[in-house]
Amino acid sequence: MTLKVFTAFSGYDSQCMALDRMKIDYELVGWSEIDKYAIMAHNAIYPQYKDRNFGDISKIDWENVPDFDLFTYSFPCTDISSAGQQKGLEEGSGTRSGLLWECKKAIELKRPKYLLMENVKALTQKKFLPYLHKWHSFLTEMGYTNFTQILNSKNFGVPQNRERVFMVSILGDAWFDFHKPFQSDKKLKDLLDENVDDRYYLSQRCLSSFIRKNEIQREKGNGFTFKPTNGDCIAKTILTHPNDRLDDNYIIEPLEPNVLTPKRTEYGKKMRKAYENGDFKESRHNMTILEPRTDGISNIITTVQKDNLLYEPINNKYFRIRKLTEKECFRLMDVSDENINKIQNSGISKTQQYKMAGNSIVVNVLYFIFKNLFKQ
């Protein structure tokens, strides 16, 4: 029997990617997305569903939407995330995160058997927990049994430190177990490209600025905010706006001495001295120093691309630093290279690609949720 699916706040639809990976018989009867670049990406990957975008969720007439069995709603985290202004998600508040309540109409009218919610971990914090409880109560009144869990993608075969809260809801009396976390040997370095264009590498001016700012922070007792990580690690969270902050996703790679300028050589010496002095540890103020990770996991992929730096000194001396490429960020969201190529060939800018990756859901986490939900 074909599973009928509707994805709200779809993005490029990692939910469908997970269902594709399961090889489950499904049909996307509708999706809801207003961001023009996300729509372009979705159309590039799923052209067969191009005419099924119902647009703004607050304006959908659900009477005109075909019935569906699975409804997914990864509503905006803008007003919940610690990276945002935390305006909240009060019903009727007009905030982007408040769009959650627009999903009530779909659930009340269509009564799909399965629901899947995803959002940032902050939704479970004291400030926002009452809203989550209110939503949970609404679903219970509608006859759903609900199961909530915080999952980290690093525990599901993807080397990114990304915690998200998921709620699975099943109509009627039911039981659901989230898949147990498991260890993986996959490291950030396994997802990196071998040949990267020079434009991804930080300029000498930028590197010098980072050094000065690091030294200022260290004098204040805060440690370094500039925290590169080697490829034998887990990536930090992928954000939507890359390289806005020092503690972003950057990679340090080998550089032959004869390619270095005198200034860059001095930079290398300063960084090497920092390593030799053992100045690599996190501070209590969330200010971090240059610290090689040893766990093989990237930090979380976010919309601001600020946390992943890779380093690999040559002869313990020379290296250069670059940011993650858009393709590497998509890989850390567990998107296949085939689908990445479709996105990149659709004319979407690099900035928008970074944003898209940071806004999405890690495919393999969804895969294991669906695997348990549909018992495959």
Predicted regions and their residues:
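Class I S-adenosyl-L-methionine
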Residues: 60-70, 78-293, 299, 321-322
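SAM cofactor-binding core of SAM-dependent methyltransferases
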Residues: 3-58
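Well-ordered alpha-helical segments embedded in enzymatic catalytic cores
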Residues: 14, 41, 99-102, 365
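Catalytic phosphate/metal-binding cores of nucleic-acid and nucleotide-processing enzymes, i.e., regions
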Residues: 350-351
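Glycine-rich, N-terminal phosphate-binding loop of Rossmann-like dinucleotide-binding domains
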Residues: 75
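FAD-binding beta-loop-beta segment adjacent to the flavin cofactor pocket
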Residues: 285, 320-347
